């Protein structure tokens, strides 16, 4: 086997490793190595092994923590266990933001966990903002295929120059590709990683119909398996840059494998309950980064015919995969 052939084989294997597995093999860190308490006093408790932390919401206050460093791109992950029983109005967030540095034009990448009344399941919401574009909501909401209150499950965000990918238990559930027309709407400035629990009674559950009932407090969320793998930068630099070779490999990691993409499509068809890309009441012309999937559109129209009753003009139609091909894919 010649040198060029051996090199091409190595690069093929390396790309597969990075995109498929390496992100899940990144080292875990102790809480004090990467984070600082943000608020909450005694409502934040670090386990004596230093690897896990509890955030609590009670009548007095919520709680939260923030990364010690500020990052320009990276992979950020934690295994989280949510409060059980009645949790309406409770919001638990795992997100990137620079709102403290850029009050009028901040960026944000969100995982939000929205509590519910007894007998109804938690919901997950993902969202992104760039350059203060809060007037353009890019929310998606989902149910899960497991009970997130019974055990820990891993939630991860990959943020690169061109992609944002949200994962649940290593399954990609949402991919945002940067488009030229997005401009500053794509998060591009250095951000910190935050985790918080707080009272979102005004909006979190059925638009505020059900609020937090402190009779069931304290509400406790637990975090472990903490991963902070990114390019730490100095935000005071005029043009902060990321030159870390390991972080540059995020470009490769953002290439979703065929197996991962199949799992993502199945998840979205089974568990997605809202996407701004299909909300024709909100957007008459779909935003540029949206790729409309006919199967997703059909399911959402059945789920909520008023909101998703038609497909807006101007969308890009995704490649349609045959039903037989999806049937061969592992169920989620």
From Swiss-Prot:
In its UniProt record, which GO terms are filed under biological process? cell wall biogenesis; cell wall organization; fruit development; stamen filament development; xyloglucan metabolic process
Subcellular localization: Secreted, Cell wall; Secreted, Extracellular space, Apoplast
Q: Where, if anywhere, are coiled coils annotated? A: none
Chief location bin: secreted
Name the reaction it catalyses. Answer: breaks a beta-(1->4) bond in the backbone of a xyloglucan and transfers the xyloglucanyl segment on to O-4 of the non-reducing terminal glucose residue of an acceptor, which can be a xyloglucan or an oligosaccharide of xyloglucan
Q: What does this protein do?
A: Catalyzes xyloglucan endohydrolysis (XEH) and/or endotransglycosylation (XET). Cleaves and religates xyloglucan polymers, an essential constituent of the primary cell wall, and thereby participates in cell wall construction of growing tissues.
Q: Tell me which PANTHER family the record gives.
A: XYLOGLUCAN ENDOTRANSGLUCOSYLASE/HYDROLASE PROTEIN 8-RELATED
- What protein name is recorded for this chain? Probable xyloglucan endotransglucosylase/hydrolase protein 28
Annotated organism of origin: Arabidopsis thaliana
High-level lineage = Eukaryota, Viridiplantae, Streptophyta, Embryophyta, Tracheophyta
């Amino acid at each position: 086997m010649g040198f060029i052939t051996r090199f091409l084989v190595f690069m093929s294997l390396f790309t597969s490793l990075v995109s498929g597995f390496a992100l899940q093999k990144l080292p875990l860190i102790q809480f004090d190595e990467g984070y600082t308490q943000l608020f909450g006093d005694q409502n934040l408790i670090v386990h004596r092994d230093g690897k896990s932390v509890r955030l609590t919401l009670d009548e007095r206050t919520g709680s939260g923590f923030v990364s010690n460093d500020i990052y320009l791109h990276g992979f950020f992950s934690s295994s989280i266990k949510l409060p059980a029983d009645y949790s309406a109005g409770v919001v638990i967030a795992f997100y990137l933001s620079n709102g403290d540095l850029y009050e009028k034009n901040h960026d944000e990448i969100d995982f939000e966990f929205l509590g519910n009344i007894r007998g109804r399941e938690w919901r997950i919401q993902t969202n992104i903002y760039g350059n203060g574009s809060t007037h353009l909501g890019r929310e998606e909401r989902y149910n899960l295929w497991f009970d997130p209150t019974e055990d820990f499950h891993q939630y991860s965000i990959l943020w690169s120059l061109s992609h944002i990918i949200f994962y649940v238990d290593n399954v990609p559930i949402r991919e945002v590709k940067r488009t030229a027309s997005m401009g500053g709407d794509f998060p591009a400035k250095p951000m910190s990683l935050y985790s918080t629990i707080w009272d979102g009674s005004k909006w979190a559950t059925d638009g505020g119909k059900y609020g937090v009932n402190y009779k069931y407090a304290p509400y406790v969320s637990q975090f472990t398996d903490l991963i902070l793998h990114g390019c730490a930068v100095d935000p005071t630099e005029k043009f902060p840059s990321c030159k870390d070779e390991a972080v540059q490999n995020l470009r490769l990691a953002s290439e979703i494998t065929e197996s991962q993409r199949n799992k993502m499509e199945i998840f979205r068809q089974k568990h997605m309950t809202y996407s701004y890309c299909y909300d024709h009441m909100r957007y008459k012309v779909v935003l540029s980064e949206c790729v409309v999937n006919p199967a997703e559109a059909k399911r959402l129209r059945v789920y909520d015919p008023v909101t998703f009753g038609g497909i807006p003009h101007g969308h890009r139609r995704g490649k349609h995969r045959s039903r037989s091909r999806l049937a061969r894919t592992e169920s989620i």
